[in-house]
Structure formats: C-alpha cells, structure tokens
Curated annotation (Swiss-Prot):
Produced by macrophages, IFN-alpha have antiviral activities. Interferon stimulates the production of two enzymes: a protein kinase and an oligoadenylate synthetase. This is Interferon alpha-1. It comes from Equus caballus. One of its GO terms (molecular function) is cytokine activity. Residues 1-23 form the signal peptide.
Amino acid sequence: MALPVSLLMALVVLSCHSICSLGCDLPHTHSLGNTRVLMLLGQMRRISPFSCLKDRNDFGFPQEVFDGNQFRKPQAISAVHETIQQIFHLFSTDGSSAAWDESLLDKLYTGLYQQLTELEACLSQEVGVEETPLMNEDSLLAVRRYFQRIALYLQEKKYSPCAWEIVRAEIMRSFSSSTNLPQS
C-alpha cells in the first residue's frame, strides 16, 4: 500500500531526529540519507499494493531490538547497521534486479552504502569511548532471522511482483522503525 506523502514525511522526520540524536556526531548527511532511502523505496513501487492483499505476511519485525532504553549508543548504532546491511543484501539478490528499475536500484545501493559507511565511522568512534559489546547476540539473531523469513517468503512466492511489493512495503516500515531509536 502506498503511504501518503505526509505520512512518509512524518516517518522520515522521526527517523532522522532519532538517529541524529544518538550523539555520535553523525553528519547531517546521514539524516538526509535516511530520507533519501525512504523516498527511493517509495519510488520503487511498481504495482498497486491493493492487488497484493492476498500475499500479505507478518514477517515478525523484531521491534523489541529497537525499543526501550536497553541500548547504549554502540548497541543502537550496531542494530541499525545490521538492519541496513541486511536490506542491502536483500536488494542485491538476483531476483531483486529483475523486479526493480535498475536506475532506482543503483541509487538505493548507493544510499544504503553511504549509510553503512557513516554508521561504521560512528561505531569506531563510539567503541573507542565505551568498552561494551556492540550488539547482544540475541538481538543480532533476531534481526537476521527476520530477514531470513523475508528471503524465504520471496523464495516461496517465486519472487513474484506481488511478493516483492509486499517486501518493499515491509522494508520501508522496518527501515523507519529501526532508525527511530531512543535518545541516549
């Protein structure tokens, strides 16, 4: 389902505000990167989500990984990094290149890569400050299993256009949720 532009922009503002408030000196371009990735995902829609209602699926996004005050900065940044890395991997598959406009897909790769680079620099800075583990093993597994469920769904649906549309909408939702971290 296509999100109204006002709702999409509200999600972007919340995401940008929260990730930038982590205090790890992420450049302003990181929040712009969040906006750009969400806008690109929105532009990638090829078919009406209403024609794919029968294909909807609950992938079990691990919201608990991104909720609450259980994270310090390095763990929060690490969780976002893992999510973006998994999104990059998902859209880098052979099935993905056949499903999407190549130009938009290339822009998405570039945007995600820039996000990863900025987060890695931020992680390096934060790890030097604190000696805490980057990400709880259970949290890491929860994020990876979530993306495994998505990959399995695509495989079971034979990478159909509706399956990709459901996944695209899910990734928009999870990207918004994963970058909307608590302030620390």
